[in-house]
């Protein structure tokens, strides 16, 4: 139920979590006009299923609305076999903040801090970090408590991520990823908790041994996605890797399956690896990233 964005927004709204204003039923043109009149342009068309920036269109004026909806539907159908789309008010300068949750079948729920995924291209994340440099401890605890409360109410089990837009000190729920995300390593780095291990234990019916008071965010971690793309057009670029040197050392982690002679396929996503750095401060973590990103 939380894997569908429309259903997830309804559920979170019912549990008291603030959501972005939107409209789900696009069959009634009068309701669409009323919604847009209320929130004003720009708005965004979103696919109800899937992710990765597919089935999304930003609309700034009325003349482009029908075209954007039709294009989003076609892309959503092709990508997720579900053409359902909905409209939301488009926030012009938000941060993309997400909260990591871990829940067992005994009603235990913990949050493991946040990730800031605001650096994106074509609605796809490129750089992720934890903790966010824009959140205060008060805001972090406030939204984390809301997430724990909502997950307990719906009886969620496993790992998951609640994604929010954050603007003017306010959080707006967008969607939930009911899986382990690409950017989970930065959370592992600052908490010292192996999310893959915990996910398996929970799936095996075991009780969480981690308590909320045990979770402390230490230091800073940044992840940079490594994509096989043309350097000018950013079009996915399959081919053979003829030279590869994997960076390493203190505060460096690389998640990848590539090697010298590896052939990048023409199918699937263009991401072939992730460079994750850790430091006692954000500045140290960033320095590690800049020093090692060209070595890959």
Predicted regions and their residues:
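Glycine-rich active-site loop/lid that clamps phosphate-bearing ligands
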Residues: 213-268
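Active-site "cap" helix and flanking loop/linker of ATP-utilizing ligase/carboxylase catalytic domains
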Residues: 135-169, 177-231, 290
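Extended active-site and interfacial segments that coordinate phosphate-rich ligands
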Residues: 105-133, 178-205, 238-255
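Mobile "lid/hinge" segments at catalytic clefts and subdomain interfaces of large enzymes
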Residues: 272-275
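Structural beta->alpha junctions
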Residues: 231, 278-282
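Conserved small/polar residues in nucleotide/adenosyl-binding loops
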Residues: 286-296
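Short amphipathic alpha-helices within nucleic acid-binding modules
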Residues: 68, 283, 289
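N-terminal beta-alpha lobe that positions the nucleotide/phosphoryl donor
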Residues: 1-162, 166-181
């Amino acid at each position: 139920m939380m894997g569908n964005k429309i259903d997830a927004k309804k559920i979170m709204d019912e549990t008291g979590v603030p959501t972005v204003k939107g409209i789900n039923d696009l069959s009634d043109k009068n309701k669409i006009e009323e919604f847009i009149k209320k929130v004003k342009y720009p708005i965004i068309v979103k696919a109800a299923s899937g992710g990765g920036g597919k089935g999304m269109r930003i609309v700034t004026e009325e003349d482009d609305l029908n075209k954007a909806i039709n294009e989003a539907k076609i892309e959503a159908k092709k990508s997720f076999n579900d053409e359902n789309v909905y409209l939301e008010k488009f926030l012009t300068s938000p941060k993309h903040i997400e909260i990591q949750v871990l829940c067992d079948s005994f009603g235990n729920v913990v949050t493991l801090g946040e990730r800031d995924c605001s650096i994106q291209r074509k609605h796809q994340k490129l750089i992720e970090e934890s903790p966010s440099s824009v959140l205060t401890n008060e805001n972090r605890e406030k939204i984390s408590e809301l997430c724990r409360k909502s997950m307990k109410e719906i009886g969620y089990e496993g790992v998951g991520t609640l994604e929010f837009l954050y603007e003017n000190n306010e959080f707006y729920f967008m969607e939930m990823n009911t899986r382990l995300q690409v950017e989970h390593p930065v959370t592992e780095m600052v908490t010292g908790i192996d999310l893959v291990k915990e996910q398996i234990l929970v799936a095996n019916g075991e009780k969480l041994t981690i308590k909320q008071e045990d979770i402390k965010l230490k230091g800073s971690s940044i992840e940079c996605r490594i994509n096989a793309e043309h350097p000018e057009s950013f079009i996915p670029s399959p081919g053979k890797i003829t030279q590869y040197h994997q960076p390493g050392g203190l505060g460096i982690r690389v998640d990848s399956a590539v090697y010298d002679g590896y052939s990048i396929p023409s199918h699937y996503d263009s991401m072939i690896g992730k460079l994750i750095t850790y430091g006692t401060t954000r500045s140290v973590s960033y320095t590690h990233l800049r020093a090692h990103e060209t070595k890959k």
